[in-house]
Each structure stands twice: as C-alpha cells, then as structure tokens.
Amino acid sequence: VSKNGKVLYSIYDKGSYNIALLDKIFYIEDDFVGYGEDYNSNNELNPPIVELNNSKSKTYEDQFPNMFIMPKLMMDYGTLKPGFYFSSSEIINRLSLFGGASVNKLNDVDLFFIFDFKRFYPTIYFETYYLTRNTTDNSLYQGAYPINDDIKFRLVQFRSGLKLPFYGSLFDLSVTRQWYRAFIQEEVMTNEYGVLEAGAAYDYFRGWSINSAWSFNVVKNTLDKSINPSKGFSLSTLLDLEKNDFIEGLNLSDSGTLLEEFKPNNLARFQINGTYHYELPWEKRWTVSLKTHAGWISDQSVDPFFHFYLGGMPGIRGYPFYAIQGTNSALFDAIFRIPVFREKHYKFKWMIFQNSTLGAIFQAGDAWVDNFSMKRSLGIQWRLNGFSFYNFPTAIELEYHQPLDKFDKEINEEKITYGEKGRAYLKILFDF
C-alpha cells in the first residue's frame, strides 16, 4: 500500500499470476461483507512499517526438516516388491537427498540414491544405482544329467556431474561408470556321485562414458501443464562418448582361475529430441502435441547390447521393448488430447482429482542398422492427476496401443512375429 492509498497485489487469472494495481479504495459496509463486528478483535494491531529496519544481518545457516520416509509397493514382472522412498531438502533447497530401496521374494534388490548440491552457480550432483536380478535355468548335460542353474545378475552405476544454466537453457556435463556382473551356481544330479555343485562369477560389461546434454524448454506454464501442455516447445540433445568392454568369452589362467575375455565396443552416441505443443483455436484446451526423436551410433558394427531399442513405453508402444533395435533410430509421435474435466476437486478416499484428459496417439518410426523399415502404431490414452494424502502429486495414465505393421525376427534359431497383438500400459507416478 502506497502513501497515497494505491494497492499493489497479485491476482491469479487465466492460468497464471499477474501483478495488478488498485488505484482507488472503496470501503464496503460491514453489513454487506457478512462478518460480525468483533471479527478482528483478536488480531494484533501492529503499526505500519514506516521507518528503516536497523536489525543486524547474520550469515544464513542450513536448516533441514526431518527425513521424509514413504513406503511403496510395486508389482514388478509378476512379483510384489515392497520398499520405501526417503528424501530431505534444505529449507531453501540448497541441498537435497532422494533415494529408495525395494526387494521381492526372489531377493531382487533395487537401490538408488540421488544427491544435489546447489550452493554454487552450477548444481553439483551425484547418482548411484544398484540392482540385482535372480533367475533359474534347467538343462541336460550329455542328454542324461539334469543341471539346475541359479543365476544372479548385479548392475552397478555411478554418475556425477554439473548442471549449468545458460540463457534460459541447461547444460548437463557428467561422467558415468558402470559394470555388470553375473553369478552362476550349478547343481548336477548324478547316479555315481550324487549332487555335484559348482559356481562361477564374472564381469560381462565394464564401461566409462563422458556425457554432455543440452535442453531448452519454453512450454507455457498453465495449471494443467503436466497433464495437457498447450503452447510452446522443448528441445534437447545428448552426446555420449563411451568406452565399453563387453564380454566375448571366458578362459582359464595358468593357475586355473576364470578370466573374462573382453572386446572393445567404443563409440559415440548422439540423440536429439523435440516437442511442440499447440492449442486448437476453436475449442478450449483441445491440444495437439508433436514429438520427434533421432539417434545415431558411430560404430555401426557395435554389439546389439549397445543398440537403441525403440519399442515399449519409451518408443513405439504397440511393440515390445526389444522388438525394434539398431544403431540408428527415428521416431515421430502425434497426440491429440481433449479435457474430460479441469481444475476440479473430486475427493475419493485419500486422493483428490483435479484434471483428466482423453487422447489419441499415432506413432511411426524404426531403429535399424542397414535398412529403414517403418513401424506404425495407433493408441488411446486416459490421464488423471491430482494429489494423494493432501500433499503428494499423483499422475495416473492408462494407454492401449495396436501395432499396424507385422515383421519377423530370428532369435536363437526361432522365428518370432511382432505386430499381431496390442499392448496396454498403466503408470502411477508423481508426474507424467
């Protein structure tokens, strides 16, 4: 409030906050407001601040709230996987911690930890991931002796880097170290010697990479931006220089210990992504989103382990994840969305739903080594977002996709046909 009675305030209008100025003040009679005469009797009558505040400043000290821990329950490849998330953030977000852990009845473990340090101009971050997977395999030795294999895979990754803002965009420079290891425990049932046991452990992948990424996002901020973006575009590029050692075989040393034989698979990997959002002028919040992706690997003869995979949820969703692969990739994605409801407050148990949309999706693209062959898919999408337990963002997405093109692949001398069946996807996350 200025000396001459003008009021400067913020007002929320058309999906954004704006600064407004009230030139004249009109007093409203208490009878029209609806409050009793003693409504303000308990408020402290503090005088307005009209003099310079001479309080002495002091250096800010980090302040942390208590660690937040939230249990979780996942259904992962047919098994229940209970676990928890933990997080804590400094009051003004100068430092944050986030991690999680889960395990299932097969002793498959998922652990991750993310640390962000934001005291300097660049954000310094560190990430680590630790995963194990257990499986079994049965076979016959010389067609007579049954062999039971207990197989365990362990995946470890460390990543550290800097995030640098630059004229509205963001550079991300990082170094990644990862290695994968396998453990095999065999049991052979024989008539002569009973049960024979043997085991082995070996690394099958070791890799270093230097990563540089750039992203630029000018998508308009609206109340339903996450569920139904309507205006603006985003661009991102990623360049990885990778030094990869991938297992080619196993051998024995002079002392009889197991040795891995690695083959170099060094490469440069480049990717570019773009998204454009547009709101149709004749209907409110009817939107079209266009997405493109292109990728290239410098070594066209690299092992398929390092290929782009363009099926499943991150790619053409009418096909399984491993169905489409290659050293080159291209994808076009068009989504048309209409709102079911907007800015509502529907309560259901511990959840509050605010926005919902229906969408139609068309996808086309391929990942290839020698020849490009178009794969297409049509899908429908339903989205719902809001909050759980009054505080936690909740985003629910259900999709069904039908492939339009059939093709065959030969894997282990077996022909597999893709494109005959549709696929459904359900996601429940904090955001879309």
Identify the role of each PLM range:
Residues V7-S10:
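Residue position within the beta-strands of beta-propeller blades
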Residues Y17-N18, D23-T128, A213-F216, K220-S230, ...:
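Outer-membrane beta-barrel initiation region
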Residues F166-S169, D203-F205, K225-S230, E283:
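Edge/loop elements at the starts and ends of beta-strands within beta-rich repeat scaffolds
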